[in-house]
Amino acid sequence: MEKTDEERKKAQMLDARARNISHNVRCTECGSQSIEDSQADIAILLRQLIRNEIGAGKTDKEIYSKLEDEFGETVLYAPKFDLQTAALWLTPVIIAGGTAAGIVYQKHRLRKNVDIMALNLIRGVPLTPKERVTILDVLIPPSPPPQGVVSRLRRWLNR
């Protein structure tokens, strides 16, 4: 009687392992379902292949490798993180960072140009330090208050 309990537990463990692997494999016919959830013929065959491989004593990694070799990387829900995947995920971040840096640089450059123009206007004019500060205060416009997305949206909607 004990052997049957042990055999039953072993069979349940193998079945749970097969289901776990099947949940991580995409049905090649359905596309959006795992082979565990799909009733397509190919999904049934893949589930049987996984159970046969487990019965042969292969590890999960070996089974995933075999499936990837036979059906391609798209059959797995968790593809490898390689150079192509990194480029796919990091490109939007790099573009957003570059755009933000460009905007900050343009605003800084514009502000710096106004300061230089104001200084060039009063160059050579005999002024006391107090008069110089007063004229620069008049010539250089104040920095605009920081504007958030909400205030810009309101201004755009009120046009």
UniProtKB/Swiss-Prot annotation:
CDD domains: CcmH_N (cd16378)
Segments crossing the lipid bilayer: 83-105
Phenotype reported upon loss of the gene: Embryonic lethality when homozygous. Arrest of embryo development at the torpedo stage.
Entry-linked InterPro entries: CcmH/CycL/Ccl2/NrfF_N, CcmH/CycL/NrfF/Ccl2_sf
Mitochondrial matrix face of the membrane: 106-159
Binding site for heme: C27, C30
GO biological process: cytochrome complex assembly; embryo development ending in seed dormancy
Location(s), subcellular: Mitochondrion inner membrane
Membrane topology term: Single-pass membrane protein
Statement: the UniProt record of this protein carries the keyword Membrane: yes
Gene3D superfamilies per record: Cytochrome C biogenesis protein
Residue pairs linked by disulfide bridges in the UniProt entry: none
Keyword Transport belongs to the record: no
GO MF assignments: metal ion binding; oxidoreductase activity
Stretches in topological domain Mitochondrial intermembrane: 1-82
GO cellular component: mitochondrial inner membrane; mitochondrion; protein-containing complex
Keyword terms of this UniProt record: Cytochrome c-type biogenesis, Heme, Iron, Membrane, Metal-binding, Mitochondrion, Mitochondrion inner membrane, Transmembrane, Transmembrane helix
Main location: mitochondrion
Pfam families, A to Z: CcmH (PF03918)
Subunit structure as annotated in this protein's UniProt entry: Interacts (via N-terminus) with CYTC-1. Interacts with CCMFN1 and CCMFN2.
Family classification: Belongs to the CcmH/CycL/Ccl2/NrfF family.
Function per UniProt: Plays a central role in mitochondrial cytochrome c maturation. Probable component of a heme lyase complex involved in the reduction of apocytochrome c. Forms a complex with CCMF proteins (CCMFC, CCMFN1 and CCMFN2) that performs the assembly of heme with c-type apocytochromes in mitochondria.
Protein name stated in the entry: Cytochrome c-type biogenesis CcmH-like mitochondrial protein
Lineage of the organism: Eukaryota, Viridiplantae, Streptophyta, Embryophyta, Tracheophyta
